[in-house]
């Protein structure tokens, strides 16, 4: 049975003090839950190396929230996947809806980043999802196909071997309105079946997470669905006790 991936995306939040407290608490509680779960933390870039030093010894994995499309060069203010790897990052979030909406990242840019991550033997967490307008127009599957096709066109049929997908309906991100777990199950099954057309091995081993207003109150309803393989958690992951509750819930389904 595949392990569930429970990932904390802290976005632009945290301080040295709050992160130190969070990690001290987590390290004291987490050991019994690591057998059946893969736990990932994606802090702001400035805290990556500090977090790595705290979590590496207990087998919690480090993720970056974003990278540039370039590995080196005169690109002031950007962060390289190569540099991320050098400081212990294993996973990199690609194409989060906030990057798409606030930084105008399109499928082409996201595909370039995906390829960089794969070529460095890191693991991309590819975020895909539809807007509320697209959902109401019954275009969800069409949009997801377009987002997935951009990856296949750039990297080939085996693109999703050693990769993670996070389905995050854009209308649910940061709104407090989570999607219906049964509908999410259908979409996750669609994603896996679509990838299976290109590569059976990818589809059979693929982890597809759900992200969008996840809390300890609704996490179980998502995780009990057969094709929801984990969670990408935003605001709820900033609260140490809430995050641990979600991990415990995940562990109870294995």
From Swiss-Prot:
It holds the Pfam family TIM. The active site is at 96 (electrophile), 168 (proton acceptor). Involved in the gluconeogenesis. Catalyzes stereospecifically the conversion of dihydroxyacetone phosphate (DHAP) to D-glyceraldehyde-3-phosphate (G3P). Substrate binds at residues 9-11, 174, 213. It is found in: Cytoplasm. It catalyses: D-glyceraldehyde 3-phosphate = dihydroxyacetone phosphate. Its main location: cytoplasm. Belongs to the triosephosphate isomerase family. PANTHER family: TRIOSEPHOSPHATE ISOMERASE (PTHR21139:SF42). Its EC number is 5.3.1.1. This is Triosephosphate isomerase. Keywords: Cytoplasm, Gluconeogenesis, Glycolysis, Isomerase. One of its GO terms (biological process) is glyceraldehyde-3-phosphate biosynthetic process. GO terms for cellular component: cytosol. It comes from Buchnera aphidicola subsp. Schizaphis graminum (strain Sg). Homodimer. GO terms for molecular function: triose-phosphate isomerase activity. Pathway: Carbohydrate biosynthesis; gluconeogenesis; Carbohydrate degradation; glycolysis; D-glyceraldehyde 3-phosphate from glycerone phosphate: step 1/1. InterPro entries: Aldolase_TIM (IPR013785), TIM_sf (IPR035990), TrioseP_Isoase_bac/euk (IPR022896), Triosephosphate_isomerase (IPR000652), Triosephosphate_isomerase_AS (IPR020861). It is an enzyme of class 5 (isomerase).
